[in-house]
Each structure stands twice: as C-alpha cells, then as structure tokens.
C-alpha cells in the first residue's frame, strides 16, 4: 500500500533476495505508482542472471505509460564481472526527468565513462552469450549444492529459494545475534565474510546474505566454516 507521504515522490524496485519479479507483480506496483504520481526507479542490474525456469520482465517494457513513469538502471558489471570498469546505463524515456538526471550526474562528476568499460560493455553484450549461459548453469548448480548442504547439515537455518542472481539469504534468527554483530563475529572467529541483512533495512534483521558467485570449493569451505562457527556457540 502506498503511504500518503509517498505521493509525488519516488519508489525504488530492487531485489536483494534473488527473486525474479513476475509480470503481474510489476503491473500491480506500476499501476499503484502511476495512480499516486510516484516515479519508479527500477534497479535491474542483475537482469541477465535469471535461471532457466524463470523469465525477466523489464519494467519499462510493460506499457508506454510504465516506460514514461520509470527510470531503469542496468549494468554489465554483475553478469560479466566487470564492476571495476565502473560503467552503467540509466534509461529514462521522460525528457524532463532525463534532463534532471543528466544535470545531477554532471554536477556530481559521475558522467564520464571509462573507455575500456565502453569496449567491454560492447563485447559483453554482443559476444558474451555463450559465457553467460555457462555462468548461469554454474550459479544454479552452486545454489543446489548449498541447498542440499543446508538441508543435511544446517536445517535450522533456512535459505531463500534462488530464482536468479547469486545472492542467497539465510535466516539466522535462532542464533539471537544482531546481524551486524554476527557479520563481525563470522569474520573474526571463522574467517567468513557474509553481508548483514540489515544493510537493506530493518526487515533484514536476523538474516545473512551469501554470495555464491565463486568456485564450488570456495562455497563448500564457507559452508564448512559457518557450520563450525554455529556448532561452537
């Protein structure tokens, strides 16, 4: 439900839990936002990393009205592992809003792109399909490995069902440790760095986020260290 204080403001759609938004979900959000004059900022940076059973729907593709009431942010940095080249795209159909964005990125001096990033983006989008398909298969296999490991060794720590991306949320409420404290203790006591769920707001309290975009041996070692940590509490 859109609160009255949001009328005329902005709403940011992001996915920190690995869900692939269904078209009908986006339609419901978009209709509410348009009705209340809310601009949707859709963070679609992980859009290429969708598992075969699911389908990515660009928010702006739903209708012309949605396109003009949204700002879409994408980048090849996640799917093609080129974050160090610092390049991204802001897609905005509304001319007035686009002018404000252009002025803002110039005022903040983040408008210039890395020439190597431009070339890497062109190569990634034009010639990276085979590599990307293999990556998605590997990421899904990593998730299935983690899911089976948790069922067998960590049943008291449920994880989200990953539909895309490489970020898995684990429910650690039973430990009774604040997420930020748990983050530091895992680093100091287990040599394992996970992200505290509270980085996404109070709703993330009690959750930890795993990045499984790594060799399976690294993931296995991380799960082993986490298991050892919780068993020694």
Where are the predicted features?
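Single conserved hydrophobic/aromatic residue that forms the stacking wall/gate
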Residues: 1-8, 13
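Active-site pre-lysine segment of PLP-dependent enzymes
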Residues: 14-39, 46-82, 96
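Active-site C-terminal subdomain of aminotransferase-like
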Residues: 65, 92, 96-116
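Short helix-loop capping/hinge motifs at secondary-structure junctions, enriched
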Residues: 65-67, 81, 95-100, 129-131, ...
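PLP-dependent enzyme catalytic core of the Aspartate aminotransferase-like
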Residues: 66, 176-178, 185-194, 200-233
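Structural signature of PLP-dependent enzymes
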Residues: 99-106, 124-147, 179
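Conserved glycine-rich beta-strand-loop-beta hairpin in the small C-terminal domain of fold type I
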Residues: 115-118, 122, 138-147, 159-172, ...
């Amino acid at each position: 439900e859109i609160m009255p204080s949001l009328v005329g403001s902005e709403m940011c759609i992001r996915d920190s839990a690995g869900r692939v938004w269904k078209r009908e979900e986006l339609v419901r959000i978009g209709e509410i936002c348009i009705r209340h004059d809310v601009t949707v900022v859709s963070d679609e940076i992980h859009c290429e990393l969708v598992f075969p059973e699911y389908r990515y729907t660009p928010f702006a593709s739903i209708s012309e009205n949605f396109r003009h009431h949204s700002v879409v942010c994408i980048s090849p940095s996640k799917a093609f592992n080129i974050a160090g080249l610092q390049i991204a795209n802001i897609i905005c159909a509304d001319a007035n809003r686009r002018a404000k964005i252009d002025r803002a990125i110039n005022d903040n001096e983040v408008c210039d792109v890395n020439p190597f990033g431009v070339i890497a983006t062109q190569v990634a989008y034009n010639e990276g399909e085979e590599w990307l398909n293999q990556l998605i298969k590997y990421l899904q296999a990593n998730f299935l490995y983690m899911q089976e490991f948790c069922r067998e060794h960590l049943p008291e720590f449920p994880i989200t069902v990953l539909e895309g991306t490489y970020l898995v949320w684990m429910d650690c409420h039973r430990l009774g440790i604040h997420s930020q404290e748990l983050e530091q203790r895992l680093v100091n006591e287990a040599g394992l760095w996970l992200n505290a769920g509270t980085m996404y707001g109070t709703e993330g309290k009690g959750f930890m986020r795993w990045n499984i975009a790594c060799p399976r041996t690294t993931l296995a070692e991380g799960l082993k260290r986490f298991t050892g940590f919780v068993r020694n509490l």
